[in-house]
């Protein structure tokens, strides 16, 4: 089976996909990321003792802002009028990590997977940035698309 990269034209050059003739549908994507850290670092965040302030609130806002700016940082992404962006951060002390889940929605001609992935990634990077003075060996891991709905390719759920 041949798979074609939609962002590469017949000449092998990168280009933005033409979505002019695509149908407008309800689209949604959910992505995740994890930030693994020492128990002591997580405790500082959860106890509100971090010297830079509320780490989760800052990461949540950063993720939302990033989703809205995805087309500015991912070269071939279409600028989208997102109708919903949600970023949820959940501490998992039993695993010494924070789970980040983002959701993006719109009614449009192209999907919101990159926006959801960008939101989760930037929220994770923000946690790293705010905590790097305390711990430099944190690990951002498992950044992935969990689910997407809408559009020609239909429903996708990560295994």
Curated annotation (Swiss-Prot):
Q: Catalytic site residues?
A: 129
| Annotated CDD domains | MoaC_PE (cd01420)
* InterPro entries membership: MoaC, MoaC_bact/euk, MoaC_sf, MoCo_biosynth_MoaA/MoaC, Mopterin_CF_biosynth-C_dom
Is-annotated flag, keyword DNA-binding?
A: no
One short Pfam name that applies is MoaC
Q: Give the domain of life.
A: Bacteria
- UniProt keyword list: Lyase, Molybdenum cofactor biosynthesis
The answer, when asked if DNA-binding is one of the entry's keywords, is no
One Gene Ontology term from the biological process aspect of the record: Mo-molybdopterin cofactor biosynthetic process
| Pathway annotation | Cofactor biosynthesis; molybdopterin biosynthesis
Q: Residues that bind substrate, according to the entry?
A: 76-78, 114-115
EC annotation from Swiss-Prot or TrEMBL: 4.6.1.17
One term of GO molecular function? cyclic pyranopterin monophosphate synthase activity
Q: Which reaction does it catalyse?
A: (8S)-3',8-cyclo-7,8-dihydroguanosine 5'-triphosphate = cyclic pyranopterin phosphate + diphosphate
Q: How does it assemble?
A: Homohexamer; trimer of dimers.
Question: What family is this protein classified in?
Answer: Belongs to the MoaC family.
- Briefly state the protein's biological role: Catalyzes the conversion of (8S)-3',8-cyclo-7,8-dihydroguanosine 5'-triphosphate to cyclic pyranopterin monophosphate (cPMP).
Q: What is the name of the protein in this document?
A: Cyclic pyranopterin monophosphate synthase
Q: Which organism is it from?
A: Psychromonas ingrahamii (strain DSM 17664 / CCUG 51855 / 37)
What is the primary gene name for this protein?
Answer: moaC
